[in-house]
Amino acid sequence: MDQGQTLARLLDSYATDPRKRAVAAAVGAIAEASIEISELIGQGALAGITGAAHGASNADGDVQKDLDVRAEAAIVAALKNVPYAALASEEAEALLMGDPQAPISIAYDPLDGSSNIDTNMTVGTIFSIIPNEPGVAPFTAPGSCQLAAGFVVYGPQTSFVLTLGDGVDIFTLDRKDHVYRLIREKVKVAGDTAEYAINASNHRHWEQPVRDFVDECLAGADGPRAKNFNMRWIGSLVAEAYRILTRGGVFLYPADSRPGYGDGRLRLLYETHPMAFVMEQAGGAASTGRERVLDLSAAATSTHQRSPLIMGSSDKVNRIVELHLDPSAASRTAPLFGRRGLFRT
């Protein structure tokens, strides 16, 4: 690994044609905005950031925090000189249209996990860059068409995770020089990790295949997986994804039976698509339980379409898919545990 590599240098070497130059400009602009957002978060109440509701709701119906609004403004301002055809943001009901002949469109969540601000927990920014095809409705291509994707983690360090379609690199913000420096190159998701992340309070609402997988993990060394597992749940998508990239495991935000959760809660364009692209580029996998996330396309009328997300180590994602597609797989693997989970319903 080149210890002197920076995000800016990587983008310079990548920008070899007009479309790649637009991608590089977009990633660079988001990186610049993320430095501003990181400083706001770091100042917290000293900068007037309290986690209080702003008084409005975003396009998804979530109550906006004051930092949601400031993060959105920072990103829109940073992208003003980038040649884009359209922007799709969690914080905006409609697309922000640019030059219809521009080579790219950009989808982003300016501040994922903003409900964590007042508890001083990890939040982040997520983005996806796709090619623009003049005459075709923006953001209707499958996720496999993404040119670049990534996310920023505002934690103890501010880290920038990026794929340009050729592996995944992780950069950390050098606060002294205000540049992102490469710390991990061509990251690979570990396969043999005994960790899974899911909000277990929703167990009664899950479909049976999700219950079966969790029951296998809970059974530990005495169960069909013959291994003790730890359950994690941070409630921050970027933090969960970063942990998986650095030490493996699997994250589940499945569909469930609650009203409004039939397609999960995460948004396809600016949450599940970019996360799935990052995971696959790092040798992992991402599925809804039944379909590869990168095979999904958004409807032209649904910028904020939802999708379940199961991502992480390929072996675990594949096992969950197997349980969805072949329910008898649970009883074949371990009849004692297939329907006798540790949670009673």
UniProtKB/Swiss-Prot annotation:
Family as reported in the entry's similarity comment: Belongs to the FBPase class 1 family.
Quaternary structure note: Homotetramer.
Localization per Swiss-Prot or TrEMBL: Cytoplasm
Name used for this protein in its record: Fructose-1,6-bisphosphatase class 1
Keywords assigned by UniProt, alphabetized: Calvin cycle, Carbohydrate metabolism, Cytoplasm, Hydrolase, Magnesium, Metal-binding
Catalytic reactions on record: beta-D-fructose 1,6-bisphosphate + H2O = beta-D-fructose 6-phosphate + phosphate
Necessary cofactors: Mg(2+)
Domain of life: Bacteria
GO BP terms: fructose 1,6-bisphosphate metabolic process; fructose 6-phosphate metabolic process; fructose metabolic process; gluconeogenesis; reductive pentose-phosphate cycle; sucrose biosynthetic process
Positions of substrate binding: 112-115, 199
Gene3D superfamilies: 3.40.190.80, Fructose-1,6-Bisphosphatase, subunit A, domain 1
EC number: 3.1.3.11
